[in-house]
Structure formats: C-alpha cells, structure tokens
C-alpha cells in the first residue's frame, strides 16, 4: 500500500525535478526502515545519462523542497538515484531510449498462457512490440503484452 503522503510529496518532487532539468521517474517512501527512507528516481529531460554528481547536486534542492513543505514529521533519509537495469519499460520514451537493448517480454499467447520472449528491442508501435530473436523478428501483439523489462546481455 502506498504511503499516505505520496500524493502530497509527488508534486513537490516533480516540480523540483523539473526546475533542475530532470523528470521525476518514481518516488517511494519506505517506512519499514529506521529512519524511514524517501527514494526519488530522476532522469534528465534531454535524455542524457544522470551522473552521480547530478544525484548529489539534486539532493540539496530536493531536501530543501521537502523541508519547506513540512510534510514529513519524522526523521528520514533522502536517496536520489536514476533508473537502472531491470526496470520495466512503460512510456514511449522508454521504448525509444532502449531500442536495441536486451529485453524480456512477458505476454499471453493465443491460449491465454503466460510466455516469455527474450531478444533485442526493435520497437513498440500501436499494434505490436517487435523483438529481434537471433536475427528473426518476433512481433507480439501489444494487447497481449503484460510487461517489457530490460535484462542484462547474458539474460
């Protein structure tokens, strides 16, 4: 269950990220850790890589924004990162950015059984996700796709 403050904190994080040339990818509040942890994932709006210096530089403004809103009343750790390998591709931008990267597509076949297909991502259009599997193009109906996830080159 998402933390009840997430709807209040998300717009603060999104606007702070935008003001510094980033896009908010995800925010999580982990209350099972002591102190609780606020994890903020960002990516650059221009599509270039987020560096460690970017994360460190964004930590200050993000922390100040959270403090100014006084939404968190207990001690917390703020973690800034960028999405890494293993993430699920969701937006059109994700599919463009990771074209030719190794992916695993989870989908339902014609009988409704879950299937997995690994290969290099070619594209996602309105109708299909296309993956290169050892030189052959596999087209999977977009309506059948459950998820597309980046994988390491060795699988």
Curated annotation (Swiss-Prot):
Entries under Pfam families matching the protein: RimP_N
Function: Required for maturation of 30S ribosomal subunits.
Any Gene Ontology biological process: translation
SUPFAM superfamilies: YhbC-like, N-terminal domain
Family classification: Belongs to the RimP family.
Gene3D superfamilies attached to this UniProt entry: RimP-like superfamily, N-terminal
Intracellular or extracellular location(s): Cytoplasm
Cystine pairs: none
Family annotation (PANTHER family): RIBOSOME MATURATION FACTOR RIMP
Keywords of the record: Cytoplasm, Ribosome biogenesis
Keyword check for Cytoplasm: yes
One annotated Gene Ontology cellular component of this protein: cytosol
Lineage of the species this protein comes from: Bacteria, Bacillati, Cyanobacteriota, Cyanophyceae, Synechococcales
Protein name: Ribosome maturation factor RimP
């Amino acid at each position: 269950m998402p933390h009840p403050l997430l709807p209040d904190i998300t717009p603060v994080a999104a606007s702070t990220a935008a003001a510094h040339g980033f896009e908010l990818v995800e925010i999580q509040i982990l209350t099972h850790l002591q102190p609780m942890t606020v994890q903020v994932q960002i990516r650059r709006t221009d599509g270039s890589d987020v560096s460690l210096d970017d994360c460190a530089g964004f930590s200050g403004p993000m922390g100040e924004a959270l403090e100014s809103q006084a939404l968190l009343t207990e001690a917390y750790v703020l973690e800034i990162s960028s999405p890494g390998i293993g993430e699920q591709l969701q937006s059109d931008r994700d599919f463009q950015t990771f074209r030719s990267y190794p992916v695993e597509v989870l989908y339902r076949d014609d009988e409704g059984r879950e299937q997995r297909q690994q290969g290099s991502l070619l594209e996602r259009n309105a109708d299909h996700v296309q993956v290169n599997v050892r030189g052959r193009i596999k087209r999977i109906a977009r309506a059948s796709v459950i998820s597309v996830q980046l994988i390491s080159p060795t699988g």
